[in-house]
Design a protein with these regions (language model features):
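Short coil/turn segments at secondary-structure boundaries
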Residues: 97-106, 116-120, 334-346, 413-420
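Long amphipathic alpha-helical segments
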Residues: 58-83, 87-92, 118, 273-309, ...
Length: 456
């Protein structure tokens, strides 16, 4: 196994450059799945904690009404029923499900990434499509929507020891034993633990350390320049490339053709680009390498204006935060309002009934409370106060409408029943308006799917 430390360092540098994107995606994912009080804040005493802890310290009970998840379900449901139903499908990859989950990732992070390979798996020899998490993907800074400015990309992968041996032993028993020993040493030096079932495996992933019992593999594709000969065969009309060391082979072929009176192959030296793939272990050992005309990844970043990535979820996070704060404020107001407080004058306690018995009988059906009435003084009274109209409900309605306006997902797209008096034409118009608002996202994702299908 050769050493490729320089190429591993280049992959690591590219991975570190994507730290901001991964942190942004993690925040959006948390908001999507309900962890909406996890942003870090600084307390007045200088302590740093998440918003949930800060609100509890201040006496609030943080409330959450997850509207973002509902929006995504509506969009994905529309995609499944109206768009994906007419798409290419196969029995091997279950593309409808893969594409739905990729769309969900696209809405959350603004990134849609898949890997298409032709290989043998448990399902047989086929062209396989795999979802690649942006948390495991690395790529140089790109600004071209078509990906023509990509120079390095790849992913970090976790494989079982058996899979590593199967993929990289190349039919050599000694190499298989060397691979087992190599990764056994790496596992002994690591300190990663297993991930609980149902928990995220990518939230705090590192570049070099694999989960317990797994082997970390870094797959890196670099665009390199290579010397080649551009050839033209007059006999067949084919134009093709030969390796840079094929000059003698071409000359010998032409000598043979000259003796037979056949047209000679025309060739000239040229420089071209090819993708150099390397599978590396965390210590820089090269497990396998190959050259290819194209890399196996298909990706789409949205909207990629000046290279920036912004997702659908990012647009509605602020409205979601406002809704949560209003719900928390309303809960605080209601919890601090007097609700059935009993005012019992101290000088009216009955000798034969304690204050505890009086409180219990007051709340009991058909209860009897004894007290000593005082001339000119009111008896025990129950106080119920109303918090009053502070405008919280109106502000909450405003934020809910703003979420519809910002996201473009209205009641018609959600499948909600039409309100009383609404005509069918108006309801259909609202549905079409929602679809038009999301057409840019659907269009961007459709170009991604088309590019993927061309690789199948």
């Amino acid at each position: 196994m050769n050493d490729t430390k320089n190429h591993l360092d280049k992959a690591l540098e590219t991975w570190l450059a994507g730290a901001q994107l991964r942190a942004q995606r993690l925040r959006h994912k948390r908001y999507t799945f309900g962890k909406q009080w996890s942003d870090k804040v600084e307390m007045s005493d200088g302590r740093v904690c998440d918003e949930h802890t800060a609100m509890r310290i201040m006496g609030y009970n943080p409330a959450t009404n997850n509207l973002i998840r509902r929006l995504l379900k509506s969009i994905i449901g529309y995609y499944r029923s109206s768009i994906a139903a007419n798409r290419l499908s196969d029995d091997v990859n279950n593309l409808p499900e893969i594409d739905a989950r990729t769309l969900e990732e696209f809405l959350i992070s603004g990134c849609a990434i898949q890997r298409v390979t032709y290989e043998r798996r448990r399902g047989g020899l086929a062209r396989w499509v795999d979802i690649v998490s942006p948390a495991r993907f690395f790529i140089n800074s790109v600004t071209d929507l078509r990906g023509d400015d990509v120079e390095i990309l790849g992913q970090i992968r976790d494989m079982s020891p058996n899979e590593v041996v199967m993929r990289f032993s190349m039919g050599d028993r000694r190499r298989a034993d060397a691979l087992r020993n190599h990764f056994a040493k790496l596992e002994a030096a690591g300190n990663c633990r297993s991930t609980a079932t149902g928990a995220s495996v990518n939230d705090y992933i590192s570049f070099l350390d694999a989960p317990k019992g797994m082997c970390r593999i870094i797959e890196s594709w670099e665009l390199e320049t290579v010397e080649q000969y551009l050839c033209h065969d007059p006999m067949s009309g084919d134009i093709f490339y030969r390796n840079g060391d094929a000059a003698n082979e071409l000359e010998n072929e032409n000598k043979s053709r000259s003796n037979d009176g056949k047209p000679l192959i025309e060739f000239r030296w040229d420089i071209s680009t090819m993708w150099h793939c390397r599978f590396m272990s965390p210590d820089g050992s090269l497990l396998h390498e190959e050259y290819s005309d194209a890399h196996p990844y298909v990706f789409r970043f949205y909207p990629l204006i000046d290279g920036e990535i912004h997702s659908f979820v990012e647009d509605v996070i602020q409205q979601q935060r406002n809704v949560n704060r209003l719900l928390t404020l309303n809960d605080r107001i209601l919890s601090t309002a007097a609700k059935g407080v009993l005012l019992f004058p101290e000088n009216q306690y009955a000798r034969d009934m304690s204050i505890e018995e009086a409180a219990a009988n007051w709340a009991a059906p058909d209860g009897v409370v004894l007290y000593r009435a005082q001339p000119g003084m009111p008896g025990p009274q129950q106080v119920v106060s109303s918090p009053g109209d502070l405008g919280v409900n109106r502000m909450l309605d405003l934020q809910l409408r703003l979420i519809e306006d910002v996201s473009g997902v209205n009641g018609a797209l959600k499948g909600q029943a039409a309100s009383a008096g609404m005509s069918a034409s108006l309801y259909d118009s609202q549905h079409q308006h929602a679809v038009s608002s999301l057409s840019d996202i659907f269009g961007a994702f459709s170009t991604f799917i088309e590019a993927r299908n061309q690789m199948l």
